[in-house]
Amino acid sequence: MDPRHILADVDLGESKIYFSKNPIVLLCGGYVPEKEHADAKDPPVRSLRDALKRKALSMMNAPHIFRPEEIKSWHEDGVYRNLMDFEADLASICSLIAIAVESDGSIAELGAFSQLPDFQKKLIVFVPEEYADDKSFINLGILRHINERHGSGVKVYPWNPKYPLEIPEHVVTGVMDDIVEELNVLKKTQSLSLGNNIHIVVLIYELIRLFVALKEGEIVEAIKGLGKNI
């Protein structure tokens, strides 16, 4: 069955994107150590992101938290030339992007994601209290930019990234509560927009789910038939 014939009858004006009932949180931030083997003792906490990962594992109804480094082979086959392109596509299929500003890498991720319009309203940033009043590029530029577009997108907490073992439990709990609250207020549907890259990713997924075996060229042609070149 040619997907173009099916899509020819689709009314884009009446089409909606229905988001997953099991949302995924892309969690970026500081270093998270891996256990040497399943029976090894847990290593010391190395970052707020590490503490959040452990917190989620101990919760009964924790949000599904995913870290970019869990995919080890992103650079193979030449699909992605750099990590940020990979993370941008990964973020497209996640419901929320949470960033703990506690490392050089997390600052780079913050700068990249904050400039992508599709992500600005699903971005939540956790900033150490000691950085909050600093007249830096991050505060005066990036964080102000996020606040203007997503009023609850920046949260300040009393923790010092240099001393991860001293992160208070109430900080970890508060951050997790903020993540859950953001997920609860996310829109469940959106009108389909071919100008939204996130919607294009969802559309590609649905095409593959419906037609199972599609060549890359067939997917491109099907979406082109809707009026979008990719």
Name each region found by the language model.
Residues 1-230:
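Conserved catalytic or regulatory cores that recognize and/or transform ribose-phosphate-containing ligands
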